[in-house]
Regions:
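Structural detector for internal amphipathic alpha-helices that build alpha-solenoid repeat scaffolds
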Residues: 1, 10, 18-33, 53-68, ...
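Amphipathic alpha-helical scaffolding segments comprising HEAT/armadillo-like alpha-solenoid repeats
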Residues: 1-11, 30-47, 68-81, 101-115, ...
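Short inter-helical turns and helix N-cap capping residues of alpha-solenoid HEAT/ARM repeat scaffolds
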Residues: 15-17, 47-52, 82-85, 117-119, ...
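A short linear-motif detector with a strong N-terminal bias
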Residues: 16-19, 39
């Protein structure tokens, strides 16, 4: 285990939330699977304090890059709890998708997120789809666009599918992107314009 990883894992137990958050962010970048168990333990403790939502977000995002599919049951339970914070549900959707992708089961993970009806969770999953540049099969793409287009074009749920669609194909996708270009949100229009040109742009999650 690299020295940087060992030190970051140690700091997950620091009394300071800011230092724990910094450690989680570093582990997210390092993407070392040896940190997965420590991150899961730290996250279980962290979610007990709603004041540390930023730290919870970073730990959840880090679990998505350092964890394993065996962490999915805990993550899925966490993100559907009624008291789980908005930021953690966003990161949870991202992490569920990433860990599922390790087993090539991301289409099932997307459908699971869609079935919850939680726009925040779905947005997190689509954020990961965009960052991983995943091509989706036609059925999954249709399910995603049905979910998104049932919402107002003013809704932020449109942004990440507009980015991710750079790697999708089909008439439905083209119609969605064309609609986004003329829609009310400038960020979505910009992302859709790039996707129509086959470019993912340089967007990054928080």
């Amino acid at each position: 285990m690299a020295v940087d990883v060992v030190e970051a894992i140690r700091r997950l137990q620091d009394p300071s939330s800011a230092r724990r958050r910094s450690a989680a962010k570093r582990l997210e970048r390092l993407s070392d699977p040896s940190a997965g168990p420590a991150l899961l333990r730290a996250l279980r403790n962290e979610v007990l304090d709603p004041r540390t939502w930023e730290t919870q977000y970073r730990m959840t995002m880090a679990l998505g890059t350092c964890g394993s599919p065996s962490d999915l049951p805990h993550l899925r339970t966490l993100v559907v709890r009624p008291d789980t914070l908005h930021a953690v549900r966003t990161a949870g959707g991202d992490a569920v998708l990433r860990l599922s992708h390790m087993e090539e089961s991301h289409p099932e993970a997307i459908r699971w997120c869609l079935d919850t009806g939680d726009e925040v969770l779905v947005g997190g999953a689509l954020q990961a789809v965009a960052m991983l540049r995943l091509a989706l099969d036609e059925e999954t793409t249709t399910d995603v666009l049905d979910f998104v287009e049932a919402r107002s074009p003013q809704d932020g749920i449109y942004f990440w599918p507009a980015v991710a669609a750079a790697g999708w194909s089909g008439q439905r996708v083209h119609a969605f992107l064309t609609s986004c270009v003329s829609g009310p949100r400038s960020d979505v229009a910009e992302a859709a314009t790039s996707s129509l040109a086959g470019s993912y742009g340089t967007y990054r999650p928080f």
